[in-house]
Amino acid sequence: MKTAIFTVVLALAVFAVLSFGWEANEKALSEEFTELIHEKEAASETEARECRYFWGECHDPMPCCDWLVCRYKWPITYNICVWNRTFPEK
């Protein structure tokens, strides 16, 4: 009986140590992923957009990209860029 209880307590201790290791690894991975997302976001903010992308709000100063056209779409209360059924040339 003592051996069975000792085995169960030992198994619980091993599981606790393993789960602590997984949590630490998961937290480090989460922090690394968050840092990567912030880097990508900062890089995209520095690029100047020449045109509005799909479903972006459009008006005269900011035209839609070449393969999009500015249209009024109900129930949206402003103009958005929608596909004009052409493909951009690369």
Swiss-Prot record:
> In the UniProt record, does the keyword Signal occur?
yes
Propeptide-annotated positions? Answer: 20-50
Q: Where in the cell is it found?
A: Secreted
Please name every pair of cysteines joined by a disulfide bond in this record. Answer: C51-C65, C58-C70, C64-C81
* Source superkingdom: Eukaryota
Expressed, tissue-wise, as follows: Expressed by the venom gland.
One Pfam family assigned to this protein is Toxin_12
Q: Which GO terms label this protein's molecular function in UniProt?
A: ion channel inhibitor activity; toxin activity
Any one cellular-component term (Gene Ontology) = extracellular region
Annotated signal sequence range:
1-19
Q: Which UniProt keywords apply?
A: Disulfide bond, Ion channel impairing toxin, Knottin, Secreted, Signal, Toxin
Family, according to the entry, reads as follows: Belongs to the neurotoxin 10 (Hwtx-1) family. 13 (Hntx-13) subfamily.
Notes on the domains: The presence of a 'disulfide through disulfide knot' structurally defines this protein as a knottin.
What is this protein's function per UniProt? Answer: Ion channel inhibitor.
Q: What is this protein called?
A: U7-theraphotoxin-Hhn1l
Species this chain originates from: Cyriopagopus hainanus (Chinese bird spider)
